[in-house]
Swiss-Prot record:
Belongs to the universal ribosomal protein uS17 family. It comes from Wigglesworthia glossinidia brevipalpis. Keywords: Ribonucleoprotein, Ribosomal protein, RNA-binding, rRNA-binding. Coiled coil: none annotated. CDD domains: Ribosomal_uS17 (cd00364). One of its GO terms (molecular function) is structural constituent of ribosome. PANTHER family: 40S RIBOSOMAL PROTEIN S11 FAMILY MEMBER, SMALL RIBOSOMAL SUBUNIT PROTEIN US17M. GO terms for biological process: translation. This is Small ribosomal subunit protein uS17. It comes from the Bacteria. One of the primary rRNA binding proteins, it binds specifically to the 5'-end of 16S ribosomal RNA. Part of the 30S ribosomal subunit.
Length: 92
């Protein structure tokens, strides 16, 4: 298995920033964001689209279903939430 390379800047690791679309917003101060990525198949060498669902902390409940948002990695807020909403790129 390959280990993920983490950049360390002055004693702290660089936090990831991802872009995805909101698929659920029924919880209080939480949303579910779907993030797409492309992965190359090891045998057939074809690029496939994979999606990941992430639970994100939304302090103001400002996002709606269908919005394109930017999220950032943060400390664990609950059992499943370790991402926070930075800004809304495109409103639906």
């Amino acid at each position: 298995m390959k280990k993920k390379k983490v950049e360390i800047i002055m004693g702290k690791k660089k936090l990831q920033i991802l872009k995805g679309s909101v698929i659920k917003n029924k919880m209080q101060k939480s949303i579910v964001v779907s993030v797409e990525r492309f992965v190359k198949h090891p045998i057939y060498k074809k690029f496939m689209k994979k999606t990941t669902k992430l639970h994100v902390h939304d302090e103001n409940n400002s996002s709606k279903v269908g919005d394109v948002v930017e999220i950032q990695e943060c400390r664990p807020i609950s059992k499943t939430k370790s991402w926070k909403l930075i800004n809304i790129k495109k409103n639906n």
